[in-house]
Design a protein with these regions (language model features):
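Alpha-helical assembly-interface signal, strongest on the long, hydrophobic N-terminal helix that forms
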Residues: 2-80
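Short, conserved structural patches
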Residues: 56-162
């Protein structure tokens, strides 16, 4: 009987190691899933911001800047400026007021902004829809967000003859 107990002496430790390994793998899988879900939610939000910017009459560059600002949490490492994050919030309004791409890059630039494809489509006339597709390419996966907003700016920008 004593020999039988000695042969099973490490079973509890082996079960514990396997359980900890399984729990760790589950944690990392859930963490990766949460990263992907967050990126998808933010891509949809960025598409909605760009579509809204187009719906109120902004140009394509302003739509691009609006979507990029919405994607800051999933845009990777900040390339410019290379300081701490304390001044990032104060740079966003300055970035949005930039008139050219070069001027905008001198204010804020992130690692994955170059690989972000933002397309804004708008119809013509009354009741047009602004649609936006945001494709965010990170190191290991691609996320797409879509949004559509009814365009109201023709009501306010053009004389309706009333």
């Amino acid at each position: 009987m004593g020999r039988f107990r000695q042969a099973r002496g490490g079973q509890a430790m082996l079960e514990t190691v396997l359980a900890v390994l399984f729990i760790t793998l589950m944690f990392f899988a859930l963490f990766e899933l949460s990263r992907k879900v967050t990126a998808r939610i933010l891509a949809d939000h960025a598409a909605a911001r760009a579509a809204r910017a187009k719906a109120v009459g902004f140009n394509d560059f302003m739509c691009l800047k609006s979507a990029r600002v919405a994607l800051i949490p999933v845009s990777g490492r900040r390339l410019w400026p290379q300081e701490d994050g304390w001044n990032e919030v104060s740079r966003v309004p300055i970035y949005l007021s930039a008139e050219t791409e070069g001027q905008a890059r001198a204010i804020l630039e992130y690692e994955w902004w170059n690989s972000t494809d933002i397309s804004v489509y708008s119809g013509s006339g009354l009741g047009a829809t602004a649609e936006c597709d945001v494709s965010l390419r990170t190191d290991d996966y691609r996320v797409e967000g879509r949004a559509a907003v009814e365009s109201h700016f023709p009501l306010y920008m053009f004389d309706q003859g009333l």
